[in-house]
Amino acid sequence: MSWDQVWIDVNVATMDPSISAPYGAITNAAIAVKDGKIAWLGPRSELPAFDVLSIPVYRGKGGWITPGLIDAHTHLVFAGNRANEFELRLKGATYEEIARAGGGIISTVNACREADEAELFDLGRQRLNALAKEGVTTVEIKSGYGLDTETELKILRVARELGQHHHVDVKTTFLGAHAVPPEFKDNSDGYVDLIINKMLPAVIAENLADAVDVFCENIAFNLEQTERVLSAAKAAGLQVKLHAEQLSNMGGSELAARLGAKSVDHIEYLDEAGVKALSESGTCAVLLPGAFYFLRETQKPPIDLLRQYGVPMVLASDFNPGSSPICSTLLMLNMGCTLFRLTPEEALAGLTLNAAKALGIEESVGSLVVGKQADFCLWDIATPAQLAYSYGVNPCKDVVKNGKLVHQ
């Protein structure tokens, strides 16, 4: 056989639902890679003969290989920080109170408007490096800290540039409807007009976004405004998704389902009608335990209902300066289990197969199957559950991206 590399002495959590074992596991396995894709995968005892003198062989020392992790919800291109708001919250101020007083998203907007692309790129690269060290091979990056055409485009350009200069694949999302900027404080409909008539066409003209998102909440945009933005995005051929049901239940999830959204994110206040709608539309539920933890929320997402209706559950970092300044997917695995009572297998699926579904890329990544992209990680662990069980010592030993060893 002519392959580019072979991995042996490994166990593989394929996350392939067609394999009945937990995690889609194959123990005592081997993987062969050719032209950036998985060419062979199965028990080591069934590995076809190959020329060991000409093909690189990597030995996993009994560790576990998983698909490369996918962080399907981040805001990692931003300037400044909001440590002062952290102190205010510890003194009793709520996220909504801070936002209504002009803090929150708007304070980061001001910092991003002042920053140039070089500064934003450098900050973003540091954060992307941190995720990559934990086995992340694909990440979604949202805009939303510009709230004017120039700065929204600037953030999206930086996100695209990060993807061009880093081994991690970057999917970009235009989130101009993240908050109402000060200049439109009493005219949110006018700002929605600006998004639809000026911002979105400019984003499309430069091919800067793979999807469009809206923060559908009582401190941001109502259902009618959300539908206007997402309908315009769909008409332009872009995927749609939304932040919804984080602070209240406005019916955003049912709207998302009706529009065929890829995902609804946060969903702490999601009810059974919303869960049923997501199930019927195939929309993913993105759980963001970092924000739940950092904001000290008490209303948990309806995990049992999501299980009952078979809605794909995704885990993501929501890395951002205000509500989840936590740049770690491994910590999300632990939080998903300890805070939301996911099983370790559900948590890992939420950062692999289901995360790929939320980004519309499940045909190429998210599970380890012959023909899919060779994106995988080797972990120094005895069982996949260890990834969620323990935090603090990074067990990621090797990362293969598009068939190339990028971290060792």
From Swiss-Prot:
Fe(3+) binds at residues 73, 75, 243, 318. GO terms for molecular function: imidazolonepropionase activity; iron ion binding; zinc ion binding. This is Imidazolonepropionase. Keywords: Cytoplasm, Histidine metabolism, Hydrolase, Iron, Metal-binding, Zinc. PANTHER family: IMIDAZOLONEPROPIONASE, IMIDAZOLONEPROPIONASE-RELATED. N-formimidoyl-L-glutamate binds at residues 145, 320, 322. The gene is hutI. It is found in: Cytoplasm. It comes from Shewanella sp. (strain ANA-3).
